[in-house]
Amino acid sequence: MLSSVRSRVLAVAAVVLCGSSCTVANSPSGDAGDAGSTLRVVLAQEPPTLEPCEASLTSTGVVVRSNISEPLLERDAGTGDLRPLLATAWRQTAPTTWTFDLRGGVTFHNGQPFTAQDAAFSIDRAVNSDLQCNVDGYVFDDEEKLGLEVNGDAGLTVHTTKPDPILPLRLSFVEMVPRATSTTAKVREPVGTGPYAIESWETGVSITLRRNENYWGEAPAFPAARYVWRSEPSVRAAMITRGEADLATTLNPEDATEENSVAYPNNETTALRLDGREAPLDDIRVRKAIGLAVDRDGIVGTLLAGLAEPAAQLIPDGVVGFNPTLKAAAYDPEAARALIREAAADGVPVDRKITLVARNTQFPRVAETAEALQYELAQVGLNVQIQMADTAAHLEYQLRPFPTGVGPIALLIMHGNQAGDAAFTTSQYLRAGGPQSTFGTPELDAKIAEAGGLAGPARQDAFAAIFADQNDSVAQYVHLAHMRGLLGISPSVRYQPDSATGDEMHLAAVRPAAAGEAR
């Protein structure tokens, strides 16, 4: 277990907490706006952009999705079913053809009506253009081009190059924008159809939204919303406690109480991605040894305060393709040492420095988790150095093209499959040429391609087998934990977070608490 590292890490945590409490007392944490008519939200970081075609990025989508802009349809986080939004109905009319009926009476924030021409434009801009939108590559294959056919103002037909049983699910990630939106550059402040419109964005300070009084759906309770960002979790928690914020994302367990927060399951799974192109990580014995060297139960119980469970695959239960037969690898440092010795005897340079790259504020106690991993890998004979990075620097390691000349990298990732289907994970993280995969095998690529064309139980079984193959024959990932989130919430508001909250926090679902109402 983590007995020795626990005491060391907890001692570090105590120092951090002491420092954090001093920071709370002496740093400006407020300025989230006045209570009452404005919903006040404090984030961990400022969004890099509000461009709708980047809304599948968590830091953008948490503000944009279904607040400022909307897709044709959206996935119910509780049931996994698709429900109507800007499309009222959809159907597959041929193996490679889907038809959508669009909602009438919808206007953009600029007063222009939403029509099928706008829907076709939005899909073409996000998927078929050269803008390099995150949705193109994450949700759609980079090489996939969709055929788009407008049928009057309220009908849209989408043609795919091959049968795609989950096209409607993919389109739930494409936000609708007016057809006057630039096709040559991404926009910073978009125009959408959502319940809120952008009033102002003061860089480095705040984003203010105002209620869309012409919204086609039910009007949200709050006339305005204001986002600020504070990197320290203790500061975010203090803003809830002092009545300076109504909602606060990603609190640390030590800052959370029953009065100021609620725990919820999110879509996130933490893992180490091992670059199998560089020695010693190019040897599967070393990669499997790392999996055996990690004490998942100790990390979950001590550092993550029980707000997680050990993971054996990149997706949690509830996502199509989850394999219930896979169990997290048992903590076995002796077996790990034996594999390292065997590799060394065959000439593998097991003493070569491995850089463990982790992102600041990635999840609570991420730095301490990185230290625990470094310690555990050192105990089995590996030389690991930690590199903490900000979001931009971490993305350079996470997305292709990867940095060159940096040696073997073990990247601490946190993957959230908010779409509910394993295709979005395997195409990104397991395919040899995937945008977030460092290597793979032709055999696994073929299985991923075949599974993508299946539906129903056959699809479930095919993807479940792929995750087993990853563990047995590839081992690019050492899975750590399926995470739970802690959302700070003021007694003055009512909001029920779900597994999608970390990716898209719907402001229209928040309402003021009634007098005397229990949480």
Located regions from the model:
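N-terminal lobe/hinge region of extracytoplasmic solute-binding protein
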Residues: 42-94, 191-192
